[in-house]
């Protein structure tokens, strides 16, 4: 059975692929939306990093920072090391005990297991990558999700699932 560790390694690999793709993308794509009033691609990319900061906070208490909005390829490229660091926090937590964590969310106390937070990180990123790919396709651009899937990850990294 595929492990949470493999899923998180795939997430980290996929994040690097996505942010590399956008580090060479034309500026117009960062403002594209699925519909009026929906988040543009750049905001969704920034949200991926912001969410990872939230997971890091939930796991180890490190507060998040204000992230520079991704509005062009240059800013997207700046996120490559940020995503590497944030993904490493997730990977560092996979070997720890699956204990219940207490999270202070602006005064509201939330209880969640470590595995729940790590699983949510994987699923959440996949959902938004699908959303981003759909927005791009709507506007004549292409982000090939098959090149980002777990099969491609295993083939490229020659890892055992």
What label would you give each PLM region?
Residues 57, 61-99:
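Helix-adjacent hinge/juxtasegments
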Residues 90, 96-105, 110-114:
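Mid-chain, well-packed structural core segment of small domains
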Residues 1-7, 76-77:
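Active-site rim elements
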């Amino acid at each position: 059975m595929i492990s949470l560790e493999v899923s998180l390694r795939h997430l980290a690999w996929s994040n690097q692929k996505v942010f590399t793709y956008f580090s060479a993308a034309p500026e117009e794509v960062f403002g594209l939306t699925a519909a009026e009033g929906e988040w543009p691609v750049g905001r969704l990319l920034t949200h991926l990093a912001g969410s990872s900061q939230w997971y890091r906070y939930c796991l180890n208490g490190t507060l998040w920072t204000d992230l520079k909005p991704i509005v062009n390829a240059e800013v997207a490229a700046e996120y490559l090391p940020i995503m590497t660091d944030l993904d490493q926090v997730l990977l560092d937590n996979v070997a720890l005990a699956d204990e219940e964590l207490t999270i202070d969310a602006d005064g509201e106390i939330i209880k969640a297991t470590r595995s729940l937070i790590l699983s949510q990180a994987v699923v959440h990123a996949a959902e938004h990558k699908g959303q981003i790919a759909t927005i791009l396709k709507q506007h004549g651009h292409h982000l090939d999700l098959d090149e980002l899937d777990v099969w491609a990850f295993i083939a490229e990294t020659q890892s055992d699932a």
